[in-house]
Amino acid sequence: MSRRGTAEKRTAKSDPIFRNRLVNMVVNRIMKDGKKSLAYQILYRAVKKIQQKTETNPLLVLRQAIRRVTPNIGVKTRRNKKGSTRKVPIEIGSKQGRALAIRWLLEASQKRPGRNMAFKLSSELVDAAKGGGGAIRKKEATHRMAEANRALAHFR
């Protein structure tokens, strides 16, 4: 344990075009092997496709999708004294929920059939903003699991 004071949290930087922190968070999750410019290209192409599909502000669609996918409650695996594991429901904070939502959106878009990542990501974001798609199903499955194990909430 550190003897110094706690490290101060750094705020996420905003991206150069939209001046938005959320966009930068998504770009950092898309990025593989440090190729940030490629991640920016993928996201900007996806944003352009969203603009063409919905004819609304694509940042609003992105925010709406992330808001819809963000979970309120999740499950954490705990082992009891006898050695059996249980999935204990836990509350999820706003930052962790947003990070999970972005991760689920990207996982769901990668699983989609399609031409390229920008196309798949744009489709997933539009579907999530409307209340459908793989990421929404993942959130609902997590909520169902937490609801089923509600009796174990005192284990934390």
From Swiss-Prot:
GO terms for biological process: ribosomal small subunit assembly; translation. Pfam families: Ribosomal_S7. The keyword RNA-binding applies. Its main location: plastid. Keywords: Chloroplast, Plastid, Ribonucleoprotein, Ribosomal protein, RNA-binding, rRNA-binding. GO terms for molecular function: mRNA binding; rRNA binding; structural constituent of ribosome. GO terms for cellular component: chloroplast; plastid; ribosome; small ribosomal subunit. Part of the 30S ribosomal subunit. This is Small ribosomal subunit protein uS7cz/uS7cy. It comes from Oryza sativa subsp. japonica.
